[in-house]
Amino acid sequence: MALEKPQWKELFSEVVTSGLCTGCAACVIACPHPVLDYETDNGVYKPFHLDIDGGPEDCTHGQKGCTMCTRACPRFRNWESEIDTHKFARERTEDEVSGIGDVLLARATDESLVENGQDGGFVSALLIYALENDVIDAALVSGLEGDGSTWRAVPQVARSREDVIETAKSRYTYSANLLAYPEAAEGGAERIALVGMGCMASAPGAMQSRKAGKLARRLCLTIGLMCSKTFDDSIFEELFEAKYGIKRADILKMNIKGVFQIWTTDGHFHEVPLKEAHAFTREGCKQCPDFADEHADISTGGIGAFGDWTLVIVRTDQGRELMNAMKENGLIETRPGDDDPGAVALLHRLAIVSRKRWPEAAVPGPRRIPVVITYPSRH
């Protein structure tokens, strides 16, 4: 009996149209032919096949044996166990609620990065160090289209300190940062970092565990951004402007700290209750089980009591080596995670909530209701 070679047809039925697809675009950049593209209109954020003569699920290359799209997908079949085993040499236990790793707090020592970045500028400091010290050649990040006044997040490539500073701060509409990969590779980058939420952070591990070729080898570092959800672009006109009179072109900075915090160019500060934003949740986020980007090398989140510190989970030896080098060079300062027990408790709570999203019918998959455990901090 021939071995099964799952291809686009299976990916289309089991992930793309089942509600499990997060829109990460891993399948699109992995397609070698290429016959996959990406839909962003009307908040769709999903891959589609360009040649639909035989139907949207048909792929003549898949029928001939091409499996690259299913190798790249971080939500296809037994993805969690496969990636856990590849990255950590074991599957997680049921009480490892937010994945495998050590929790601490970190911030940049460069005050200009703290001021320009988000929650202490840690991610900016990390990317700048990696770019300037021959760790990576480029990073896949998100930026804002045009002059930034639309606040539409778009995939971009960062190759320098200036690029990192330009693309700092958070956006809360979706950007499939993996779509910037072709630009980075065509520009000669062989060692590429991916910065993204859990939906994207599992993609390199999926590709590597399933041997997806040069693409898998190039994605050498993953920095995760903790995320409960992102929002449809319509939130700007239909909520912020319609109810609060905040025009997107006037927004200077946004953050989420229990409420939607919005700073505007006229110097004013606004708070929008999160419950009012729930109706604008992006479709691809509704069944995502990964708040804590559990397959990143380093996961980061601004969920603590200290607004200028980042909650960090260091998950791999590569992540630890990078953290140690930055500390030795005086580029970051760290504190034990136990300094902010509320942040650690919130991390666990949000991780549990997100894991419960994964539908029971979609098996195998993430364990739905794990037990809470507190990890020792490295400092």
Residue map of PLM features:
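Catalytic cores of large soluble enzymes that bind and process phosphate-bearing ligands
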Residues: 19, 23, 61, 65, ...
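N-terminal basic/disordered segments at the start of proteins
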Residues: 11-29
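Glycine-/proline-rich flexible loop or hinge segments
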Residues: 44-59, 105-113
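Iron-sulfur-associated redox domains of electron-transfer enzymes in respiratory
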Residues: 78-379
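Secretory-pathway extracellular proteins and peptide precursors enriched for disulfide-bonded cysteines
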Residues: 12-13, 51, 56-58, 65, ...
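Iron-sulfur cluster-binding cysteine motifs and their immediate structural context
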Residues: 2-3, 8, 26-48, 58, ...
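Short, charged low-complexity linear segments at domain edges
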Residues: 1-11, 29-55, 168-174, 254-271
